[in-house]
C-alpha cells in the first residue's frame, strides 16, 4: 500500500547530537554525583533510542533507582541547555531540504523515545516546525514508541504511514504499531529485515511520494 504519511525518529535519523550531549552529560554527572562515569559521543550512539529510565539503569547501575533517575533527569536538563546554545551543524546532510520538500505533498510526524521538550528543541533549532504536523514522545505520554506511533496515527487519522528510524528498537516499535519500517542505514544501528532501506535521507524523496 502506498504510504499516506511518514513518521520520523530523531536521533540517528535526522541528526547526530551525541558530541554535544556527551559534554552535557559529563558535566551533569560531575556536578550531581561522585561517579567515575564519562561519556564519549560513540557511547551515546549505543544508548540513544532506549527509554531514558532504561538508559539510566544501564549507565548508573550502582545508584539506587530514585537516584539514578534523578541523575538522568539532570543529564537531560544540562543537555537541553547545551543543545540550545550549540552552533554546531547537527543535522545529517540533506535533512532540512528533504523535509521541506516532502512536507509539501506528504504529512510528516515525529515519534521519538525522548524527554519532554526535546522534539520542540529540535524543531526550534532546525527551523522545521512548520513542516511537522504532529509529534509525540514518552515524556508526554509515559508510553513506549510503539504505542506512541499508534497514538499519532489515531490522533491524525493515518491509514498507511511508514516509520523511519535507525535501530532495531525502531523496527520493533513499527511492528508493534503494525506499520512498515524504513531503516536509515547511515544512523546508529543495524536492523534485521527492514521493509525499506535508505542510505541517505534524501532517498525518501524517490522512495515515498505520498
State where each predicted segment sits.
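Short beta->alpha linker loops
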Residues: 20, 47, 90-94, 114-115, ...
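Structured helix-beta-strand junction loops
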Residues: 50, 104-105, 159
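Asp-based, Mg2+/Mn2+-dependent phosphohydrolase catalytic module
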Residues: 1-4, 116, 120-210
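N-terminal helical cap/lid subdomain that shapes the substrate entry/recognition surface
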Residues: 3-93
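Short, acidic loop-to-helix structural element flanking the phosphoryl-transfer center
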Residues: 81-110, 146
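Conserved phosphate-coupling serine/threonine residues in phosphotransfer and NTP-handling enzymes
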Residues: 13, 112-114
Amino acid at each position: 500500500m502506498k504510504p499516506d504519511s511518514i513518521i520520523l525518529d530523531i536521533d540517528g535519523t535526522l541528526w547526530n547530537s551525541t558530541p554535544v550531549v556527551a559534554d552535557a552529560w559529563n558535566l551533569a554527572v560531575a556536578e550531581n554525583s561522585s561517579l567515575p562515569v564519562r561519556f564519549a559521543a560513540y557511547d551515546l550512539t549505543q544508548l540513544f533510542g532506549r527509554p531514558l529510565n532504561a538508559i539510566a539503569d544501564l549507565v548508573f547501575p550502582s545508584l539506587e533507582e530514585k537516584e539514578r533517575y534523578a541523575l538522568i533527569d539532570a543529564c537531560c536538563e544540562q543537555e537541553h541547555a547545551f543543545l540550545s546554545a550549540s552552533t554546531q551543524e547537527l543535522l545529517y546532510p540533506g535533512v532540512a531540504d528533504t523535509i521541506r520538500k516532502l512536507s509539501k505533498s506528504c504529512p510528516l510526524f515525529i515519534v521519538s523515545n525522548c524527554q519532554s521538550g526535546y522534539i520542540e528543541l529540535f524543531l526550534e533549532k532546525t527551523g522545521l516546525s512548520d513542516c511537522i504536523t504532529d509529534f509525540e514522545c514518552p515524556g508526554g505520554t509515559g508510553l513506549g514508541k510503539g504505542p506512541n506511533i499508534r497514538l499519532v496515527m489515531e490522533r491524525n487519522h493515518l491509514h498507511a504511514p511508514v516509520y523511519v528510524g535507525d535501530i532495531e528498537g525502531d523496527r520493533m516499535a513499527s511492528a508493534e504499531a503494525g506499520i512498515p519500517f524504513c531503516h536509515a542505514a547511515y544512523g546508529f544501528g543495524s536492523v534485521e529485515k527492514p521493509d525499506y532501506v535508505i542510505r541517505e535521507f534524501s532517498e525518501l524523496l524517490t522512495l515515498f511520494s505520498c
